[in-house]
Amino acid sequence: MEIRVFRQEDFEEVITLWERCDLLRPWNDPEMDIERKVNHDVSLFLVAEVSGEVVGTVMGGYDGHRGSAYYLGVHPEFRGRGIANALLNRLEKKLIARGCPKIQIMVRDDNDVVLGMYERLGYEHSDALSLGKRLIEDEEY
């Protein structure tokens, strides 16, 4: 397995992976999300590749105060092999190299399987409530 930065030729394969991982929501246009990330800071957009196939992704961010991770997903046939752990570990190392003191990950309430994985990796529940506001409307996906 190789973990590397997203390349433009990964575009369609990544969207297909996100569909298989049930990461897409109608209010988020994955093509726009990728385009925005590539134009902002592609170095924190990582893919895991096995035998030339993209089997995992994580999209990270850092605003100078805290890091974040989004679109963490692993192809269902490749789960249980440590790929998600490896992606998060690589992202954490990149964030630490930038001086990032902490990372935040938002997880849907009903995603118990992933919550357990994050807890095993040292992530803790916070008492903060996450609020959001759409600033630019995307086309429904």
Swiss-Prot record:
SUPFAM superfamilies: Acyl-CoA N-acyltransferases (Nat). It is an enzyme of class 2 (transferase). The keyword Transferase applies. InterPro entries: Acetyltransferase_YpeA, AcTrfase_GNAT_prd, Acyl_CoA_acyltransferase, GNAT_dom. One of its GO terms (molecular function) is acyltransferase activity, transferring groups other than amino-acyl groups. Residues 1-141 form the N-acetyltransferase domain. It comes from the Bacteria. Pfam families: Acetyltransf_1. Its EC number is 2.3.1.-. Keywords: Acyltransferase, Transferase. NCBIfam families: PRK03624.1 (NF002959). Belongs to the acetyltransferase family. YpeA subfamily. This is Acetyltransferase YpeA. The lineage of its organism: Bacteria, Pseudomonadati, Pseudomonadota, Gammaproteobacteria, Enterobacterales.
